[in-house]
Amino acid sequence: MPIDQEKLAKLQKLSANNKVGGTRRKFAKKSGSSSKDDSKLQDQLQKLRAVTVDNVQQANFFKDDGTVLHFNKVGVQVAPQHNTSVFYGIPQEKSLQELFPDIIPQMGADAINALTQMASQLQSAQGANQQAAAPEAEGKDIDIPELVEGQTFEADVE
């Protein structure tokens, strides 16, 4: 049986591209760590018998540096017998000034008094810093020597 060289060349060319079993495809690995973490957290909360608190519209966490972690749409679960509270949501880091008008009705009288004291302390500290900065600026010019080309200060150091 004679072999047609053209057909043989076409078959060899096709077989070079398509290996037996098809081409190998690489699958992108999906990171499922966040869903695993959430399921572990949910399991622990079920063990603690946490109760979901409804009708919570927002939550604010005040940090020491003066910023606020603001949760606009928040889910809350509480396990009071274990002194545990869990807040779900996407936090936004905001300054206190951004949230200030909306926060006042939510705060108690003690917190408002503390805020007014903090504001007065900040204003007095800023005023003191400005007064202290003015004499320092004049004194700094005296201590700084002028640079002269060719002059070195190595002799003074030794």
Swiss-Prot record:
Residue span, NAC-A/B domain: 35-100
Compositional bias of kind Low complexity:
122-136
Keywords, in A-Z order: Cytoplasm, Nucleus, Protein transport, Repressor, Transcription, Transcription regulation, Transport
Q: Which InterPro entries match?
A: BTF3 (IPR039370), NAC_A/B_dom_sf (IPR038187), Nas_poly-pep-assoc_cplx_dom (IPR002715)
Main subcellular location: cytoplasm
Q: Where is this region: Disordered?
A: 14-42, 122-158
Q: Where in the cell is it found?
A: Cytoplasm; Nucleus
- Provide the leader sequence positions: none
Output a single Gene Ontology CC term carried by this record.
nucleus
Q: Does the keyword Transcription apply?
A: yes
One annotated GO biological process: protein transport
Similarity section = Belongs to the NAC-beta family.
Q: How does it assemble?
A: Part of the nascent polypeptide-associated complex (NAC), consisting of EGD2 and EGD1. NAC associates with ribosomes via EGD1.
Summary of the function given for this chain in its UniProt record: Component of the nascent polypeptide-associated complex (NAC), a dynamic component of the ribosomal exit tunnel, protecting the emerging polypeptides from interaction with other cytoplasmic proteins to ensure appropriate nascent protein targeting. The NAC complex also promotes mitochondrial protein import by enhancing productive ribosome interactions with the outer mitochondrial membrane and blocks the inappropriate interaction of ribosomes translating non-secretory nascent polypeptides with translocation sites in the membrane of the endoplasmic reticulum.
The name under which this protein is listed is Nascent polypeptide-associated complex subunit beta
What organism does this protein naturally occur in? Kluyveromyces lactis (strain ATCC 8585 / CBS 2359 / DSM 70799 / NBRC 1267 / NRRL Y-1140 / WM37) (Yeast)
Gene encoding this polypeptide? EGD1
